[in-house]
Swiss-Prot record:
Gene Ontology MF annotations: adenosylmethionine decarboxylase activity
GO cellular component terms, A-Z: cytosol
Taxonomic lineage from the root: Bacteria, Pseudomonadati, Pseudomonadota, Gammaproteobacteria, Pseudomonadales
Organism: Pseudomonas paraeruginosa (strain DSM 24068 / PA7) (Pseudomonas aeruginosa (strain PA7))
EC number, as in UniProt: 4.1.1.50
Pathway: Amine and polyamine biosynthesis; S-adenosylmethioninamine biosynthesis; S-adenosylmethioninamine from S-adenosyl-L-methionine: step 1/1
Keywords: Autocatalytic cleavage, Decarboxylase, Lyase, Polyamine biosynthesis, Pyruvate, S-adenosyl-L-methionine, Schiff base, Spermidine biosynthesis, Zymogen
The protein, known as: S-adenosylmethionine decarboxylase proenzyme
GO biological process: spermidine biosynthetic process
This protein's encoding gene: speH
Site (Cleavage (non-hydrolytic)): residue numbering on this chain: 72-73
Amino acid sequence: MAIQPLRLDPITVLGKQLVIELFDCVDTRFDDIQWIEESMLEAARQANATIITSAFHKFSPIGISGVVVIAESHLAIHTWPEYGYAAVDVFTCGDVLDGAQAVRVLSERLGSQRHLISSMDRGLGGHRLGLLSRSLAGNAPVDGDSPTLRWALGQGTGVA
């Protein structure tokens, strides 16, 4: 079987990456590695992801980094408890996983009061054209009616 060359086509989207910045996280367990890992696993479960494995590390004196590897790609987190801040990536491939639900679960569990969500379609050729990334901030927790999240997923008008 001959290997087919990749066509660099800007409309060939292989996945969506949500880059989420959660600010003013008020949950007191924000530096508890077991609770952060369980929160990430719960976000993956509620998003209908197929969990493969997870790995988390607790820094000294504070802070946690971790990743949940899923069949559909990954969820990653880095926390700065001293700032009440978490950086989260939700990268999804295919149309089974609900990345928005993962974002909602993490925002709620961490007690985030403000957020910034960037959305990027990942795929073949699009980066060369610079057409794929956009961001929007919100001054409220991410919930089921979050206009920021709807916008990041291409379902809203861009009003936070």
